């Protein structure tokens, strides 16, 4: 699914092609991923806890940027995702606020080849730590599937039970494909 219809507001926008267009949405679109009234109530309670004074802390000043290495498409720009993430990180950090910016860029990690395929030592544990220590935003730029981030499987739905940040809920932003299949009612994916 795409939110382009709702987020591209100019009359001349909407014919997006990665080769010919540099259009950016004018307004961010979000949704509550619920299917039942009980899920909606639970989400509302979570938001109320988040907005309460008990939820305040230094973790709300932290942004974590995670960038894929664009493997296996080595003929393309391998640091494309790092450049995209870094551009956003610079904008967040340039106002001289108390914001802390941390980076988990896959290009910076050693590669391990195993029977399971290509893996990057430490990325998965660093991502889990980023969530668990608390961050206002964790922003991922890169490849993704319905239940996994990156070809190297740096984070999967099976990792979600390892998260212990219920009292420090993170806004998880992903610039990837297939991850939040809100338009597929047969599967819950990450949406």
What are these regions (language model features)?
Residues 1-191:
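Cysteine-dependent hydrolase recognition
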């Amino acid at each position: 699914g795409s939110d382009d219809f709702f987020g591209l507001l100019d009359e001349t926008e909407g014919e997006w092609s990665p080769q010919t267009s540099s259009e950016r949405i004018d307004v961010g679109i979000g949704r509550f991923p619920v299917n039942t009234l009980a899920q909606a109530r639970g989400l509302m309670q979570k938001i109320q806890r988040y907005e309460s004074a008990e939820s305040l802390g230094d973790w709300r000043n932290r942004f974590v940027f995670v960038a894929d290495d664009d493997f296996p498409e080595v003929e393309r720009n391998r640091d494309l995702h790092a450049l995209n993430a870094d551009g956003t990180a610079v904008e967040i950090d340039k106002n001289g606020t108390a914001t802390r910016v941390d980076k988990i860029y896959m290009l910076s990690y050693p590669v391990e080849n195993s029977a399971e395929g290509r893996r990057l030592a430490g990325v998965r544990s660093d991502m889990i730590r980023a969530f668990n220590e608390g961050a206002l935003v964790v922003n991922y730029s890169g490849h993704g599937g319905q239940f996994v981030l990156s070809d190297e499987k740096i984070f999967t739905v099976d990792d979600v039970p390892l998260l212990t940040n219920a009292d420090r809920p993170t806004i998880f932003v992903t610039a990837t494909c297939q991850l939040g299949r809100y338009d597929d009612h047969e599967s819950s994916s990450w949406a």
